[in-house]
A protein has these predicted regions:
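Acidic, Mg2+-coordinating active-site environments of NTP-dependent enzymes
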Residues: 1-46, 63, 67-85
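Nucleotide phosphate-binding/pyrophosphate-handling subdomain across enzymes
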Residues: 40-158
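C-terminal helical cap/extension that packs against the catalytic core
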Residues: 3-22, 31-34, 105-108, 114, ...
Length: 179
C-alpha cells in the first residue's frame, strides 16, 4: 500500500485475509534529491533511479508502490533492475496529468475523487501562471463533489460541465446546480 496513511478498512481486510501487506513507511520507503531517487524494501534497494516519466506530485509514491509489488511478485515474476529503470523512463498513462503540446496549453486528467483532485490541483498550481484556466468537468453521482470543487475553485476561471454516457453519472445540469 503506497498510501502513507492507508484506510483502516484496507488494513483490517488484509489482516482478516492473513495477507502479507506491504505498507509505505513500514515495509518500504523512498528518498530523493533533485537528480535521482532511491527505494528500499524488506530485502532489496535500488539507488540512483531516474524520476518517473509521469508528471505530478504523487509519482514517487506510485512508483514506490509498484516497486514494492514487483518485489512481492519477484519469485513468480523476476524483473531486472535495468527493466525497472527502463519502465520508469518510458512509463506513460494517458489522461493522468497529460500535457498536450501546443497553444493553448492543454492538460488532461481523469481525477475522479478528492485525493486525485488534490494532486491535480497541486500539479496545476506548480505549473505557474496562466491568464485563464478552463475546466471541462463530468463526474459520477456518488462522488464527493463538494470536496472536489473546493480544491479546484481557486484555480479554474471558466467551467464547462459535461454529460457522461453512464447511468451512474451526474448530468451536466445537476453539476451546474451543485456548483
Amino acid at each position: 500500500v503506497s498510501d502513507p496513511v492507508p484506510p483502516d478498512s484496507i488494513l483490517a481486510f488484509a489482516e482478516k485475509l492473513g495477507a502479507d501487506l506491504w505498507v509505505m513507511g513500514k515495509d518500504f520507503n523512498f528518498s530523493g534529491d533533485k537528480l535521482q531517487w532511491s527505494w528500499a524494501g524488506r530485502g532489496r534497494r535500488y539507488s540512483g533511479l531516474a524520476y518517473p516519466a509521469l508528471r505530478g506530485a504523487n509519482q514517487l509514491l506510485n512508483a514506490s508502490g509498484v516497486l514494492a509489488a514487483l518485489e512481492v511478485m519477484r519469485p513468480q515474476l523476476p524483473v531486472t533492475a535495468q527493466a525497472i529503470r527502463n519502465g520508469l523512463a518510458m512509463v506513460a498513462l494517458t489522461g493522468r496529468f497529460q500535457i498536450v503540446p501546443g497553444e493553448p496549453v492543454l492538460v488532461l486528467d481523469v481525477a475522479h475523487n478528492p485525493h486525485s483532485v488534490s494532486a491535480l490541483a497541486a500539479n496545476l498550481d506548480a505549473m505557474g501562471f496562466y491568464p485563464t484556466t478552463h475546466a471541462v468537468f463530468g463526474a459520477m453521482a456518488d462522488k464527493d463533489l463538494a470536496a472536489m470543487f473546493q480544491k479546484m475553485l481557486p484555480l479554474v476561471d471558466q467551467w464547462y460541465f459535461a454529460d457522461l454516457p453512464l447511468p451512474r453519472a451526474s448530468s451536466a445540469a445537476q453539476l451546474v446546480e451543485f456548483w
